[in-house]
């Protein structure tokens, strides 16, 4: 078992923006895809969690673009969970995207495990295997930013009706769907 997972992705049009470069939506989709595949490989993926009535819940996500990648270039995506103790109810998973030797994006997601009866489960009870070889690598190290949630009516940009295709197996709106809704608030120009 390795403490990280790497995979190559060809930057196809579905990962690109109007300038034929990697889009925020595309980067987030790649990061979620490799996290999912890595979790399955180490025994804490959706299938194993579902057997226990649990699922991974994204608490915060951040993607920092540090370079550009363009249509049909090959990207190397890497992910690794950050160490957390057994009593933690949240942990971080980091990501990087490179094009050759050039860094393109860094990502970091804070996760929790939601168990039966919608209760948060400490990682010592259900998270990573006890002997998991955490790498100690660091990506984005800044603490997650919290936004105020006392919005006034003039703060609202648009309404959105959640579609069945937005819902994941945890019966919540999928994380990537939030990114798509947010980006749809802006014009492509």
Model regions: which residues?
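Hot-dog-fold acyl-thioester-processing enzymes
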Residues: 1-58, 106, 112-189
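Hydrophobic beta-sheet segments that form the core/acyl-binding groove
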Residues: 61-100
């Amino acid at each position: 078992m390795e403490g990280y997972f790497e995979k190559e992705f060809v930057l196809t049009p579905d990962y690109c923006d109007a300038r034929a470069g990697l889009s925020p939506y595309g980067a987030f989709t790649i990061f979620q895809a490799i996290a999912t595949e890595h979790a399955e490989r180490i025994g804490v993926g959706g299938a194993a969690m579902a057997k226990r009535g649990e699922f991974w819940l994204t608490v915060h996500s951040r993607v920092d673009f540090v370079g550009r990648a363009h249509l049909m270039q090959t990207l190397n995506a890497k992910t690794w969970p950050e160490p957390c103790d057994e009593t933690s109810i949240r942990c971080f998973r980091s990501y990087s995207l490179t094009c050759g030797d050039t860094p393109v994006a860094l990502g970091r997601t804070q996760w929790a495990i939601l168990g039966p009866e919608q209760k948060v489960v400490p990682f010592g009870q259900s998270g990573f295997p006890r002997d998991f070889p955490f790498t100690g690598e660091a990506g984005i190290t800044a603490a997650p930013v919290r936004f105020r949630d006392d919005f006034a009516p003039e703060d609202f940009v648009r309404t959105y009706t959640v579609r069945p295709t937005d819902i994941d197996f945890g019966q919540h709106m999928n994380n990537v769907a939030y990114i798509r809704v947010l980006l749809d608030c802006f014009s492509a120009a």
